[in-house]
């Protein structure tokens, strides 16, 4: 189960420098968007992911892929290949902020995601102003939607 909230922060308003934190290079594409079936390269790891419908709460299953399988599936994606840098910033309460800085045609889009252990925690989270607009309930900011723009 994936329980997350999404925000649109302004990079100039962040109280930290993303470059001070670990960064992963992510490339992903969608074989299907309803339901979501995604392939992803995360640094040197490769995955096939299924995600159910939903906004804040969705079922998610990740299966490892070989690089060869990933490269075989990559030409079969619908829409654009998404490329982004992901910075992981620790937050209070054992939470982590995943800051995605999109590249190429989706630049300068920045999306911040925070995963929660349960819905109650997600709903109770008081977002600091620097996180910007809460777009959790907007399907427009799902990567599967962005792949079609």
Where are the regions a protein language model picked out?
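Phosphate-end processing signature that detects enzymes handling 5′-triphosphorylated RNA
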Residues: 1-149
